[in-house]
Amino acid sequence: MAEDSPIDIEKLVSDKIEKGVAGSSLILENRKLGDDNVLQLSNLEVLSEVISLDLGENNISDIGVRALCDSPYIENLQTLNLKSNNITEEGAKFLAESAKQGQTI
């Protein structure tokens, strides 16, 4: 069985970002993204334009959630979809703590 080729997260983001008047949406649902990919994503400055981020149905764990919550570029994020990932109560706590600190997740 052949291994999947590595994901070029920057190319994927540039291909999938949908720019609108009020902000951008980024739909990365069901792309086999893991924690390493979310770590790369969380360091992309273009994320600061995103108001809606769909990361549902991937392979993201609490580690990826924490990387996303720690990103300096999520200040405009209003909607985050993480359905059907590998997130536990610990990941949910990271999200809740981000919300308490004034982030808009």
Q: What are the residue ranges of the model-derived segments?
A:
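Leucine-rich tandem repeat or coiled-coil scaffolds
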Residues: 1-105
